[in-house]
Regions:
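Sequence/structural signature of beta-propeller domains
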Residues: 1-175
Length: 175
């Protein structure tokens, strides 16, 4: 998706126009439309590239920065082999990229024995496993890295009959 912005004198968004909406491309150049391509997470890297996390067949792809984003093939990002053991629809749910390029990946339902959920901090080919414990009955929906190293995690809780709760949790960088 791309569009041009109209901003006011204080740089506040007033309108969007000249929208272009098209499917993202797979590593083969085909549009990503198949149910096995369940894009769940999106983060922008310091170099302007976009990183997309997928469930079902768990993987992360990096797309080049604009203006090439819409027309380029993604490059697979290395992830720990253990991610493939995540539940089909409970894998990579939140991705955040820090200013130094490290990538944080949190899972939605890939549980540890203590009830926390698996996550990883990656730097190139190095993976550091970590645990994330959401608020009671909540699950990770997405996350974002802040410039000073903290992370904001968006959590959601869904109860049948349409009751949805969401919350933001601040995770300090030193934890």
């Amino acid at each position: 998706v791309s569009a041009k912005m109209i901003l006011d004198s204080e740089a506040k968004l007033l309108d969007l126009y000249d929208w272009v909406i098209q499917p993202i491309l797979s590593t083969t150049g085909a549009p990503v439309t198949d149910p096995l391509h369940d894009a769940e997470a999106l983060a922008r890297a310091p170099d302007g590239s976009f990183v997309v996390g997928f469930e079902k067949f768990h993987r992360i792809w990096r797309y080049p920065p604009p203006p090439l984003t819409d027309h380029s093939l993604p490059v697979p990002v290395s992830i720990p082999a253990e991610v493939q053991n995540a539940p089909s629809n409970g894998g990579l749910e939140g991705i955040a990229i820090f200013s130094d390029g490290r990538l944080l990946a949190l899972t939605e339902e890939f549980q540890n024995p203590d009830g926390s959920f698996k996550g990883w901090l990656t730097q190139g080919e190095r993976f550091f496993e970590l645990s994330y414990l959401p608020s009671e009955d909540f699950r990770v929906t997405d996350c974002a890295a802040l410039s000073h190293g903290d992370v904001i995690v968006l959590e959601r809780r869904y109860v049948p009959f349409g009751i949805l709760s969401v919350r933001l949790k601040l995770v300090r960088g030193e934890t």
